Amino acid sequence: MAWHQALGFGAENYRFHDHEKLAHYANAATDIEFHMPFGFKEVEGIHSRTNFDLSQHEKYSGKQIKYFDPQTNESYTPYVIETSIGVDRMFLSIMCHAFCEEQLENGETRTVLRLPAALAPVKLAVLPLVKKDGLPEKAREIVDQLKFHFTCQYDEKDSIGKRYRRQDAIGTPYCVTVDHDTLQDGCVTLRFRDTMEQERVSIADLNAIIEEKVSITSLLKKL
């Protein structure tokens, strides 16, 4: 359950569902279910297969498969706990939760794919404010610096607002805007997908800031 909840979809969207009917070798079984738009559906199955599997190996191989407990001075055949997470079910649960259409204060509808940053295919988009005055060149320079660390996109077509919307729709968690001040102070505007909040950061700090937010390590630390 810890892995599922680390994705940030809310503990209230998960539940355990215990099996009433069990396989002949099992003494317990439960499913982890996620609240899809069409109801709670299984994303992971967990089964206690008791010592059936290893006992069968012992029986037909003629070899003992036992664990000796030094504290109790007893030997026993270990139980096997089987867990199964379907990639397709996991993908569906992520997409169901991530897709959002929200109304903005100006009346427009914003389509957002709120993918966990660690799982987003594109981590960062670098956008020159305009297609002149050396801004595209500076933006591409930043892409060249960061592309070895994570997947980046460069986009200079249409207004900055439309470019933000495109990145929101494909789930890019962060956008960097290069403006005229960038050429003077070496700083860029970092925009956050989910909140649309922006902050000014140094180009020199970009790699460390983004890496901390989008690395799989940051997700695993939540477990």
Features from the language model and the residues they span:
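NTP/phosphate- and nucleic-acid-binding module
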Residues: 1-223
